[in-house]
Amino acid sequence: MFKYTRFERARIVGARALQIAMGAPILIDVPEGITPLDAALLEFEKGIIPLTVIRPS
């Protein structure tokens, strides 16, 4: 998996958690009653968050 800075990681997980909270489907199997933030963290750890980071070159 690509090495992200702590700022990129926070932005990715936060953006994905917001998407999940607004009704986006969760891409992994999660236990019942999990928070959107926890679901986003699990997706991030498995490397399946559908977001990309574009760095200026």
Curated annotation (Swiss-Prot):
EC number(s) stated in the UniProt entry for this protein: 2.7.7.6
Annotated compartments: Cytoplasm
Domain of life according to the entry: Archaea
Enzyme class: transferase
Cystine crosslinks: none
GO CC annotation terms, alphabetical: cytoplasm; DNA-directed RNA polymerase complex
Cited function: DNA-dependent RNA polymerase (RNAP) catalyzes the transcription of DNA into RNA using the four ribonucleoside triphosphates as substrates.
Classification via HAMAP family: RNApol_arch_Rpo6
The name this protein goes by in its record: DNA-directed RNA polymerase subunit Rpo6
The encoding gene: rpo6
